[in-house]
UniProtKB/Swiss-Prot annotation:
GO terms for biological process: carbohydrate metabolic process; pentose-phosphate shunt. InterPro entries: Aldolase_TIM (IPR013785), TAL/FSA (IPR001585), Transaldolase_1 (IPR004730), Transaldolase_AS (IPR018225). Signal peptide: none annotated. It comes from Prochlorococcus marinus (strain SARG / CCMP1375 / SS120). It comes from the Bacteria. One of its GO terms (molecular function) is transaldolase activity. GO terms for cellular component: cytoplasm. It is found in: Cytoplasm. The keyword Repressor does not apply. This is Transaldolase. Homodimer. The lineage of its organism: Bacteria, Bacillati, Cyanobacteriota, Cyanophyceae, Synechococcales. Pathway: Carbohydrate degradation; pentose phosphate pathway; D-glyceraldehyde 3-phosphate and beta-D-fructose 6-phosphate from D-ribose 5-phosphate and D-xylulose 5-phosphate (non-oxidative stage): step 2/3. Transmembrane segments: none annotated.
């Protein structure tokens, strides 16, 4: 019998949601996604300490011997993400998503500048921009930054997407791909309603992605939909046929170990009837987002949590830099 993972791969691009190189080797996905939390976790795996050290050493060389430790760490944040991205691209045939500093989520020009820098770092290690997706938070400022970047041929993955207004604005901006967060939407509704579980197609995250998918396909938008942040296998199965799904290793393993029959739920060639095309000015976007309490709260929470992960990564890099430059060889940890 064919595994669920193989069946899913025949109708959806399967993406690994991890920075763990061994997990990526195991499941052989088409693409891979990273975020600050995943890079932080991977950076603390002893097997990858050499990648961190190389990133810090390259950053020190770039900023100069007289630069402060803070300047080295600031430079190394991007270097580390690109280093992991480069290693991931040695394994997968497709694209890797690398995220812009979440602390820039409300600054359009700073986001553009950071994205250009990341692409330049990839270029220096002979990675084409065609193999990189720049992850940007789906704020108005982030979406406008992505619109500029796309016009320059820099492809963007708009993340932390929870509401329909965000999806509409992303499509209008012509971004390459969006990542609606299925599981985090479910988390909010469970906390809000006190309901412990939702059956498959009634899962609020599944409902949201299905609505967005059908809206995009019915209105002939080129922006792809990549479901993300899953809490259980049922959410994944209910979105079979979505353009892409980015899946954590623990769920990839479950899919690989099951040979149940998979039914396509979404079809880009046969989308279900959807709303007619909507145009959003900035005021409309902000008003729709404000009225969607779930999307507003989860977007804010996501930016805060990713920002905290970046700060923890900074601490880890600072600690490691001091060890390297003092000749020590202690293992990495944020403790």
């Amino acid at each position: 019998m064919t595994s669920l993972l193989d069946q899913l791969s025949s109708m959806t691009v399967v993406v690994a949601d991890t920075g763990d190189l061994e997990a990526i080797r195991t499941f052989k996905p088409q693409d891979a996604t990273t975020n600050p939390s995943l890079i932080l976790a991977a950076a603390q795996i002893p097997a990858y300490q050499n990648l961190i050290d190389k990133s810090l050493q390259a950053s020190r060389q770039r900023v100069g011997s007289f630069a402060s430790a803070k300047e080295v760490v600031d430079e190394a944040l991007d270097e580390v993400c690109v280093t992991f991205g480069k290693e991931i691209l040695k394994i997968i045939p497709g694209r890797v998503s690398t995220e812009v500093d979440a602390r820039l989520s409300f600054n359009t020009q700073a986001t553009i500048n950071k994205a250009r820098k990341i692409i330049d770092l990839y270029k220096k290690v002979d990675i084409s921009k065609e193999r990189v997706l720049i992850k940007v938070a789906s704020t108005w400022e982030g979406i406008k930054a992505a619109e500029v970047l796309e016009s320059e041929g820099i492809h963007c993955n708009l993340t932390l997407l929870f509401g329909f207004s965000q999806a509409v604005a992303c499509a209008e901006a012509g971004v390459t791909l969006i990542s609606p967060f299925v599981g985090r939407i479910l988390d909010w509704y469970k906390a809000e309603t006190g309901k412990d579980s939702y059956a498959g197609e009634e899962d609020p995250g599944v409902v949201s992605v299905t609505k967005i998918f059908n809206y995009y396909k019915s209105n002939n938008y080129k922006t792809e939909v990549m479901g993300a942040s899953f809490r259980n296998i049922d959410e994944i199965l209910e979105l079979a046929g979505c353009d892409l799904l980015t899946i954590a290793p623990k769920f990839l393993e479950q899919l690989e170990n099951s040979d149940s029959k998979l039914t396509r739920k979404l079809d880009s060639l046969k989308p279900l009837p959807s709303e007619t095309k909507i145009h959003l000015e900035e005021y409309d976007f902000r008003n729709m987002l404000k009225l969607d309490r779930m999307a507003t709260e989860k977007l804010e929470e996501g930016i805060i949590n990713f920002s905290k992960a970046i700060e923890q990564l900074e601490q880890l890099l600072s600690k490691r830099l001091s060890y390297i430059e003092s000749g020590s060889n202690a293992e990495l940890s944020i403790a």
